[in-house]
Regions:
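Conserved alpha/beta-hydrolase "acid-adjacent" motif
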Residues: 140-146
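Conserved hydrolase catalytic core segment
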Residues: 9, 14, 18-47
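Short, amphipathic alpha-helical "lid/cap" segments that border enzyme active or binding sites
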Residues: 177-185
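Conserved acidic catalytic loop of the alpha/beta-hydrolase fold
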Residues: 1-10
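Catalytic histidine-centered segment of alpha/beta-hydrolase-like enzymes
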Residues: 167-178
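Alpha/beta-hydrolase-fold serine-hydrolase catalytic core, especially in secreted/extracellular enzymes
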Residues: 157, 189-196
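Alpha/beta-hydrolase
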Residues: 48-134
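Acidic beta-to-alpha connecting loop that harbors the catalytic carboxylate
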Residues: 137-139, 166-168
Length: 196
């Protein structure tokens, strides 16, 4: 539908956290449809991740159950787990919980199982598009080493790695979210490189 309505064959894609894994997997599977790709709060192999180490303690639960609890405490923990709660206005976490919980307090376990037992889900060598890798400098979902391992294998030289200061796992909700939007806009609006 997008191709039909816009008459375009390629599009920019943006994903954050498990959505970043999905966006990268799409870019790997359908590279002809991806113009520029922005991956925020992404994890590659999970090597050294304190968040995934804690989450892995429940891997057998994730294998045995197709749903997990996502209650108010869990939603608030997204904003506090990286020991930088001061980078958020917790009223945002509460507003998010208020809206999400209208639809229930259960979500599929699939992404948690994938992140604790099935990484890596994406092969960076199979993503030919330009890529922006953006992370909060306090994000516990992935280490810098894990992310640089992914970044260095990307085949396209049109790539950037951006670390946002005083920011944790959810930069789009953080007090410094303007830095995320600035970096994203700059990358998506970049001129097309001229071949040498």
């Amino acid at each position: 539908m997008l191709q039909r309505e816009t008459k375009r064959s390629k599009f920019h894609f943006y994903g954050t956290s498990s959505g970043a894994i999905r966006a990268a997997a799409f870019a790997q599977a359908q590279p002809e449809a991806v113009d520029r790709l922005v991956l925020v709060a992404f994890t590659y192999k999970g090597t050294g991740s304190p968040t995934l180490r804690d989450r892995a303690k429940q891997v057998e639960f994730y294998r045995a159950n197709n749903r997990r609890t996502r209650d108010r405490a869990m939603i608030r923990s997204i904003f506090t787990r990286d020991n930088l709660a001061s980078s958020y206005d917790m009223a945002v976490a509460d507003a998010m919980a208020d809206e999400e919980l209208k639809f229930g307090d259960q979500v599929p376990t699939g992404t948690y199982l994938d992140m604790t037992a099935n990484l890596p889900l994406v092969d960076p060598t199979k993503i030919p598009s330009p890529v922006a890798r953006i992370r909060g400098d306090h994000d516990g979902i992935a280490t810098m080493g894990d992310l640089f391992d992914f970044y260095r294998q990307l085949p396209n030289g049109d790539r950037v790695f951006i670390s946002l200061p005083n920011t944790a796992h959810s930069p789009g909700f953080a007090n410094n979210r303007h830095l995320l939007w600035y970096a994203t806009h700059a990358f998506l609006a970049a001129p097309t490189p001229v071949a040498g």
